[in-house]
Amino acid sequence: MNQQTITLAVAAMNAVHDTERNLDKYARFVAEAAAKDARLLVLPEQSLQGYLYHLNHALSPEEMNYHYDHAEPVPGPSTERVAALAREANMYIVFGMTEKVAVSSAGVLYNSAVLVGPEGLIGVYRKVHAPGDEYHVFRQGKDWPVFDTEIGCLGLHICYDLRFPEAARELALKGAQIIILPTAWPQNVGAQYDLFDRARAAENECWFLSSNQVGTCDQGQLTYYGHSRIIGPLGNIVADTGEDEGLATAEVPRDRLRRRQWGTLNIFRDRRPETYTSLASEDIYHALGPTETESL
């Protein structure tokens, strides 16, 4: 193993609504990444139990029951199994799941991204921005944690968070050197994904890893875009899975991973936060008025 470089990996995965089958696929991706000496593997949003059947539809009692019945706590049985894979492979793994928090008799569900590593469970991020029918299933998170690891400081956000540049910027300002995005991004809006993930890497001058679901959902009508990617600090795509299920990897010099690539322009030095007075205002939406949103 080259101590001067580190290998990063992202998976494009056709997740199903069957936790055991998805865990089996996790194990195969971990083995493939480990064979390439990867130290970090990112798996998609909701890839443990499966995502919503659709984004804008009438949720059936059967679907609601599925999400509640298959949700798990963190830590829990599945996080322990993935943590065991991480220990065995000496790897950091990020994966998306439906998390259940016992604050009531039924529990509260979150769309969460979990980080495990050789040392076990490291942390969890709960999705802050909820699109479409996620409002009816998941409670929204309230913060943007970053996690210091042996390979650098990692910041997590999920799917729809990508549409909000403040999310990645908050992670970068907190010290994230690698910004990670598990996602279930639909195929029909792939052009936006192509734009946003490269922009977030470039505007924060850090590495950006996105892991997307791919193919058609086994329940409902959603088809996912794939194109899980490793993107450099200049917004350049270093590795891409394309439209098929699989793994993309990149070997990166450690000194390029652990520091931002300052050039002539230093965006963090040159920021003028005192002028961005509308960013934290809760009244702007009401002033602009609601708009029609595209059906996904």
Where are these regions (language model features)?
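N-terminal active-site segment of His-dependent metallophosphoesterases
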Residues: 1-40, 180
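Active-site-proximal beta-strand elements of phosphoester/diester hydrolases
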Residues: 5-17, 112, 124-127, 153-161, ...
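Conserved beta-strand and immediately adjacent loop positions that scaffold enzyme active sites
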Residues: 7, 94, 112, 143, ...
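Cys-nucleophile CN-hydrolase/nitrilase-fold catalytic domain and related Cys-dependent amidase chemistry
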Residues: 19, 28-118, 186-200
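Active-site beta-loop-alpha substructure in enzyme catalytic cores
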Residues: 34-43, 132-204, 208-211, 290-296
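CN hydrolase (nitrilase-like) catalytic-core segments centered on the catalytic cysteine
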Residues: 71-94, 162-248
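Amphipathic beta-strand/beta-sheet edge segments enriched in Tyr/Trp
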Residues: 106-127, 222-242
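C-terminal beta-strand edge segments of enzyme domains
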Residues: 146, 213-296
